[in-house]
């Protein structure tokens, strides 16, 4: 099944994959060779640590390759949805109780990072936003309780 992902998200994953393959993988191969040179592998902590790290890196490479092979890349800058909220939209919300403003971009599940304001398309926040437009009010059921927000801006920025 194809997973929607922004162009920016795909670039980030490709950069990580390239770094793992061209920098981390050779480093770990050298570390294993160096640890082997120290002799007995049964009690060689450096060797076992390097092999464990190699296993982690190879697993992450496989994971990234799989994610990228299933990505449906969407160039947000080319979307023409106007003020309607769809995948890729950057949305500015105002909490109707506190007047606090927040800004989120709706992205694919694999690229979500709430600290960077990237919310997954499958998240409760994104589900409440999809299909709405500037001026609409949304209600989000959060662990801290029910919150009401007004959509004050919708942008499509790559």
From Swiss-Prot:
Protein name according to UniProt: Transcription elongation factor GreA
GO molecular function, one term: RNA polymerase binding
Organism: Xylella fastidiosa (strain 9a5c)
BP GO annotations: DNA-templated transcription elongation; regulation of DNA-templated transcription elongation
InterPro entries xref list: GreA/GreB_C_sf (IPR036953), TF_GreA/GreB_CS (IPR018151), Tscrpt_elong_fac_GreA (IPR006359), Tscrpt_elong_fac_GreA/B (IPR028624), Tscrpt_elong_fac_GreA/B_C (IPR001437), Tscrpt_elong_fac_GreA/B_fam (IPR023459), Tscrpt_elong_fac_GreA/B_N (IPR022691), Tscrpt_elong_fac_GreA/B_N_sf (IPR036805)
Entry keywords, A to Z: Coiled coil, DNA-binding, Transcription, Transcription regulation
Family to which the UniProt record says this protein belongs: Belongs to the GreA/GreB family.
Coiled coil segments of this chain: 45-72
Matches recorded under HAMAP family: GreA_GreB
Transmembrane segments: none
Pfam families recorded: GreA_GreB (PF01272), GreA_GreB_N (PF03449)
Described purpose of this protein according to its UniProt entry: Necessary for efficient RNA polymerase transcription elongation past template-encoded arresting sites. The arresting sites in DNA have the property of trapping a certain fraction of elongating RNA polymerases that pass through, resulting in locked ternary complexes. Cleavage of the nascent transcript by cleavage factors such as GreA or GreB allows the resumption of elongation from the new 3'terminus. GreA releases sequences of 2 to 3 nucleotides.
């Amino acid at each position: 099944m194809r997973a929607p992902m922004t162009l920016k998200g795909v670039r980030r994953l490709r950069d990580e994959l390239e770094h793992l393959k061209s920098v981390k993988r050779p480093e770990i191969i050298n570390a294993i060779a160096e640890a082997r040179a120290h002799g007995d592998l049964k009690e060689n902590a450096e060797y076992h640590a390097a092999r464990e790290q190699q296993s982690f890196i190879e697993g992450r490479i496989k994971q990234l390759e799989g994610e990228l092979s299933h990505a449906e890349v969407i160039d947000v800058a080319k979307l023409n949805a106007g003020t309607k909220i769809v995948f890729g939209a950057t949305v500015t919300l105002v909490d109707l109780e506190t007047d606090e403003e927040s800004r989120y971009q709706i992205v694919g599940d694999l690229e979500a990072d709430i600290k960077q304001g990237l919310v997954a398309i499958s998240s409760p926040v994104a589900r409440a936003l999809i299909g709405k437009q500037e001026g609409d009010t949304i209600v989000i059921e959060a662990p801290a309780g029910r919150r009401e927000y007004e959509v004050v801006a919708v942008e499509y920025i790559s």
